[in-house]
Amino acid sequence: LANNLGNLLSRVATAVGKKCDGVGPRPRPDSPLAAAAIEALEETTARWGDVQPSRALEATWQLIRATNAYLENNEPWKAEPGPLVDAVMGDALEALRIVAILASPAVPTTAQAVWERIGLDGLVADQRLPHAAAWGGYPGGVAVTKGEPLFPRRQV
């Protein structure tokens, strides 16, 4: 599961760096990812409320998988910079913002690292469900940084 989040963050940050001059675009209000984000928010919130952290994380990781599939379908790395790439990358950044909020209770340090790399200020732990994780909160116009791997591979 960790690889999925780390790979998603790396892919998005790399594409934003190359195709959007390192500045995160705003998400689309009518993004195809919005439905997956709403579903993840509802399920994750319910599972945290039931004190089922593993199921809460599984619901959060569904959004990561949906975002990876969305990127595979749209292939922004193959497109020329412009409105399509901006839309796809804005949507992916919004999904990462929501993932950071939803995962924060279980993996606070990782969630904060995602939060900062996608250009957001403050503490992800200060965000309150469900309102903070509603679709459309990513501001756009902020610097996105790739940084070191989120989960470095260990040599054994």
Which residues fall in each region the model found?
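Long, charged, mostly alpha-helical binding arms that flank functional sites
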Residues: L1-L84
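Basic, alpha-helical terminal appendages of large translation-related enzymes
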Residues: A46, V51, W61-V156
